[in-house]
Structures are given as C-alpha cells and as structure tokens.
C-alpha cells in the first residue's frame, strides 16, 4: 500500500495541512512539507490521537471511519459493500447504545463510524461493507430468509440513522486490532472490481487495524478484496440456520470450543490503546467464530470469536473452529496452523542441513567390488569407475591426510587406501596387462607366433652375458668376436647394453649365436633384468680369483626369475691366484650344482686373455640350447621384438638397437616402439653393414623413429603410420601419468606441518641428459637411492637422450637446476646461452663419478651443525667506573685466550648470569685484540654492567661440525 501524504491525511481527517503539521511536530515527528509522506505507524498514531481528542458529531458519524463500535447490538440492516471486508461477528450481545454519539462514551457509537453501519451477523461472501451507508432494517431474527439483498444504489450515507437496540444484558466487547471479518454467508456475489466503490473521502482508518495489502503471508492482498469463508449465522435458541442471521448468545456464556485450538497468548493479542474507545471487557470467553475466518475483534479475554466492539459488527459469531487471520504491518495475525514451526526450529533445521559431515563427504560406498585402474591413474579416472564426483574423492583424501587434485596422478598406495575407505578393491593394472589391452583395442597381439608348426623355422639362440663388474664379460665377448670393445669404454666398464652375433662351428655345422652384453655395475640393475628377460640362455661369468660377488648373485637371481638355463663361465683361470673349485663350491650354495658334482649346470673354465676354453663355452651353449629349448620362430609374420638399447645420434637421429624375436623386419615397415613410432629408413647389423631385412634372433640398429624409445620397450610392425602414431600417443600418456605418480613425493598434512615448523627444505633440481636411454635410466635410478636426510631433497625435473640443447638450458635457468651430461656435450648455442644465464653443467663419463659428486653436493646443502669450543677464562678482580665506557672489569686470564668481540658468558658462583660478548679489550692503556693466559686486562661486556668481584668471564666460539 502506498504511503499517505500529509495533505491527503489532513483532508481525510478534516484538518488543514498546517494544523496536521503542527500535530506531527507535537508528536515528535519531523515532516518537511504538506507533500511529504508519512509512515504507516505515524498515520496510525495520529489517527488514534485525533480520534480520541476531537468530539464526534453527526456529520463525522456519517463519514466513513476505520474504528468499530464497542457496543454489541442486534442489527436490523444489512452491511453494504466497501473496499474492505467487514470483520466477522463474534458471539455475545453488547449493551444498549445511546441514540446520539457522545465523545468518550464506552457504549455509544464512535465518531467516524455510523452505528447504523453495523450488523449482528457474519457478512456474506461477496458483499463489501461501505462505512456510512444506510443499513436497511432487517426483519426479526426468526425470519432470516426475508432479509433483502442490498443494491448498489443503497450505498448512500445516512448519518442519523437510528441504531437498533441491542438485546439487554449483552456485554460489550473490547476492540481487537488486526481482526479480519469473514464474508457473510448466503450473500450475493460482490461487485466487480471496476464497479467497486473507492475509499470514501475523509474516511479515517480503523484504530489498530492492520494495513491491507501489506501482509506477506496473506493469500490475497489489496483493499476491498473479500475472502470466502465458511458459513456462520446466529444461533437462536437451539436451532441453527444455514443462511440466516444468528442470534447472540445471552449472558456472555462461553461459546462452543471457545478455548480449543487457540494460539499461545502473546503481546500482539493485547489491546493497543487503553482509552475511552475501548468498551467493557467480556465476562466470558467466546468460541472462535467465522468458520475459517476470525469472528471479530477479541475483547480483553483471549478466547477469540467475541462479538461486538469497535472493530466488529454486533452479534455473535459462530463458536466453531477458526483459522488464522491475515497478518498486518504491525503484529501477528490470528491463530496459527497446527504444527507451525518456530523461527528457532527452522533455523536449527537449516543449520543441521548445511552442517558438514564429520569424517568426509557422502560418497556411495561399494560392496567389495574390484575396480581395475591403470598405474598413475587420477581421481577422475576412479570417479568414472565408481560413478562418483571427483570433488568428493578429493575431499575424502583430504580427510585422510592426502592433498591431491582431481586430475593429478595418484600413487598405487594412495589408490588402495582410498579404495579401502570406500569399500572397493582397487586393482592396479600392470604395465604388461595395460599394454596388452591397448593392443587388443587395435586388433593387435604381441608375443605369440602366428601360423602352425609347419611355418616355424629354427633360429639362433640369444645368449646374455651377465656377472659382476670387472669379471671380464666384455673381454670374453671380444675374444669370441675377435674385436676390442673394451678399449673404447670409459673407465674400462660397460655402461650400455650391446648385442652381437657370433658364428661358430658345432658338429661340422655353422651355427649362429646372438650375444647380449650387459653392464655389471650395481647401477645397471634394470639393464641386467632386461637382458635376462630377452634371452634364451644366460652365461654367468665369475672371476676365478674374486669368486662370487654381490652383482653375481643379483645376475643369478635375474636369470632364475626369467626361468632361463644358466651356463657358468669361470674366467681368469690364467691368474696364479685363480681357484675354479672355490667358485663351484660357492655357487652350489645358490642352487647351481656342477655336472661333475652330480648337478645339471655346465661349468666351463675360460680365459679371455689367452682364449683358453672359448670353443668349449660355445659348444656348451649350443648343447644347452638344443637340449632344453625349442628355438623356432615364424619368419613370415610381421616383425616383433624388443629395443634393448637406444640413443640419439647427431647425424642419424634416434637409433634403436633392436632384437628381432619373431617375424622379419624390412625397410619401409611402419613400427611402434614404446612411445616412439616411425618408418624403418635403414638397418645396420653388428658389423656396421647395412641390411635390407632382419630375421628372427638378429640384432640390428633401426633408423627412422621420431624419438628415442625407452630401453626395453617392445616394438612391433603395424599396418600404417596412423595406427602406429595412435598407439604411441596412448603409451606416452600412460607413461607420463605413471612417471608423475612415481616421481612425485607427496607430503601428508602432518609432514607439511612439520616442514612449516622446521622451515623450508633445500632441494637440488637436476636435468639428466645421456647418450643412451638405458644409461639415463640407470643414472636416475642410482640418484634416487641417495639419501642424506630429510633436510635436502633431490628431484629430477627432466631427462632425455642426446646433446644438451637450448631448451634444457632455459629450463635449468628458470628452475635453478643443474644439468648433468652423461657422455654428451651441449651444442654451441646451448653453451653460449648457459654462460650467459650462469647455468651449471656437469659432465661425466663414468656413472659412479656422477653419483659420488651429486651425493657430495647434497651433503654440502645440509645446514651446518655448530658446536661450542672453549677459548679462555678470565677472573674479575677489580671493578672500575668510567663515564665513557661504563663499568670496566679488571681481570686476570686464568686459562686460554680472551679475544675481543668473542662470545662470552658471565658466571657467578657456578651459575650463568648473562650470555653476552666481549665489547672492548685493553691492556694497560692499549686496546688489544686478544690477551693470553697469565696476563691482566680490562674488558667491558656488551649491554651488561652488573658485574661483581669474583665473577668469571668464559669466552668461547661456535665451530661448524662436519656432517656425516
């Protein structure tokens, strides 16, 4: 509802704008002009004050007003339509009113409201009350059906219409603010909205009535809208009439169900104004009237359904169940619905609904199902498998103490912990199974020969030479091949895997044997494992002078794990200290029993230097292959094999040393090797000769790949380059995720808090570049095993094969990393850029040199540990005062040396009084830097002067302690 302006209200109340402004100022309300608007509470107070102060006359009684009469009387006229429905009647007759209105009267009609405009019955639906309109006289209550229907033309004000006399003995009712009338039952339909009369000029508002159209909970808003309520009529005697007027209940007795369903009393139910306008309180409690509506204003009691009063028509309402009234601008409406929740309850329910759950979010848990995930899978991959949201899984892991993003690769242990929390069995697919599933999606298969037995032909055996470092493996192969590979190896040790083919004559037949040379250093464990998996027979080389060494046992275990037969070559028998029988006895403890001892393992004594026993070794290899193995393959199928080594050649690009296991590789074939793919441009055998094809068990160097494959990657020939590229890209994505999950050292919340307490952790970042993929892999694995404590961390941020490029230098400059070059050098532009950016590049040709220097660098990054070292002691024998330097201690040096600016502590009676330092030191009149034992001196302490005779000054220094 719009706000009322001053001049409109003045016109309505019959005052001038100036008078109304004065009254507003007297009330303490500041209003600027007559065009200003007034808030609804001020309008209400103003109307109450003017209504109680001004006398009522006949002219004002004819004007429409919002106040109700406090007298209850039996109406003989019907209510006419107004802009707002009249309040429903409440039972109980009122006292007899006087014919003329008197100001301040408690029983007569009020000013501004004609007593003839009141009825004793509940208003009918559709009828709209018009204040000041002449009410037609109604027949007696015994004949309610003869009551005429009002017409629009009857809405003419009749100020002096006599009010009918009420029934004697009926008590008057007190007004109840906010009461809303129910529609009169049995009445005709209301006028259309266009035909409804507007507000009467000069009409005042009802005292205490809520403003219509301002109730947010009302089903209908606006002035003059009627509500269809249940029918209620007067009760005459014991009879009830459906559409007639009901007689008020005599004697003020309680109406039916007077107290049932009533709301709890609250301050809104109390009368707003205690003035002469308020009539007498009822002596009894009436029932709730008006059906669903309110039967009228309440009296001083709280029963509800009271009749009469200044805000309701005279007469009793139906003593039945009432509904809630419409809430106005100030105060609550009628009785609330049953089960209505308080604001506190609603707030509590809302808080409980929004409160976080203890222990994590709600995620659908499984029933122990098995979920297969690839290695390095993310939480998004797991969420797709179990039909959950990735954000929920992130929250679950956070509650478990792990901080992981939705797309970050997760380690296997973390996935298993998360699966156990959600009641799922997480099964991490092995790389072999994952690669098999990938190839099956392209209708490919690796590892099986195609065709039947008639398509299989004999192939040479593949022999891997294994053993401890410096036991003569490469020298033995040089003797077999009549070459000198050892001379070209840095440090005299093999740091790359190599493949060669040797021709030998066995039983007057030329036989080919393929040898694979593996490194013996402990850093090349992965290479030895790959060599054992790619071989048919393992030759275990043991030096006769050293015996069984750690890498000998490791190579033995690799061969047993690959389930390949083993031939033992006892080397260096030409040395005087050689003891082949000792070697046989040691290997017997590991399950290798010689044939001469009743076992099944062939032992051959050889000397790579004198070529003694080489033919016996070749014969033993061939006999073992023929006796224990079925060495056949299909040469007509698409080639498949393994890349045992790979490197980046400056002139030829990526070069892979491949061992053909089945099929025949031709120039022009589309191949995919790990995450690399390409077309075979050229093939070179172990003698350096170009070949057009490679048969099974033949080692060749393959050129034409787009990148350097990983050492040990399987390769196979596919139909076209497109399929090869798709397989390579999928493998690369899988390897990247697995590498991230493996290399990322994720901290838990507890570890993070501990780190924050201790301070930042020093970290050494490395970029590894090598000449071969196997060498880089071996170097990275060896560096990962370095452990110097929790204060320093080592992390490899990039790795690659080939020369050091400008990209590597840029990354190192941006991340403050160190570049490690293993048998490689930077390009000219990269070297110039490294000099400009002050990037540190370290070059190594032997792997253990790199490991030792990097470990030393890590130890140098450790925070130093200091320990206290005593320097000397001085005894204070006399104290001097000086205005320049303060208190001077005259001392005798009793032990060691006292130096100026050295740390010192003042000790009194064996108790440390102060930690300070020597500020000044003087002997006689000369300032000195130190004073030795047996001499006197004068000294002052920094920021301390409370010294006594007999105190000791102990001088010391902090010396760095070397870290282990």
From Swiss-Prot:
Alphabetical UniProt keywords: Cytoplasm, GTP-binding, Initiation factor, Nucleotide-binding, Protein biosynthesis
Compositional bias of kind Basic residues: 335-346
Intrachain S-S bonds: none
MF terms in GO: GTP binding; GTPase activity; translation initiation factor activity
GO annotations of cellular component type: cytosol
Region of interest called G1, as start-end residue ranges on this chain: 467-474
Compositional bias (Pro residues): 86-102, 159-169
Region feature Disordered, mapped onto this chain: 49-357
Domain annotation tr-type G: ranges: 458-629
Composition-biased stretches (Gly residues): 252-261, 284-334
Broad class of the protein's primary localization: cytoplasm
Gene3D superfamilies: 1.10.10.2480, P-loop containing nucleotide triphosphate hydrolases, Translation factors, Translation initiation factor IF- 2, domain 3
Region of interest called G3, as start-end residue ranges on this chain: 517-520
Record: residues binding GTP: 467-474, 517-521, 571-574
Region (G2) location: 492-496
Compositional bias annotation for Low complexity: 62-85, 103-117, 190-212, 242-251
Region of interest (G5), residue spans: 607-609
Family: Belongs to the TRAFAC class translation factor GTPase superfamily. Classic translation factor GTPase family. IF-2 subfamily.
Function per UniProt: One of the essential components for the initiation of protein synthesis. Protects formylmethionyl-tRNA from spontaneous hydrolysis and promotes its binding to the 30S ribosomal subunits. Also involved in the hydrolysis of GTP during the formation of the 70S ribosomal complex.
Identification of the protein by name: Translation initiation factor IF-2
Native organism: Cutibacterium acnes (strain DSM 16379 / KPA171202)
Gene expressing this chain: infB
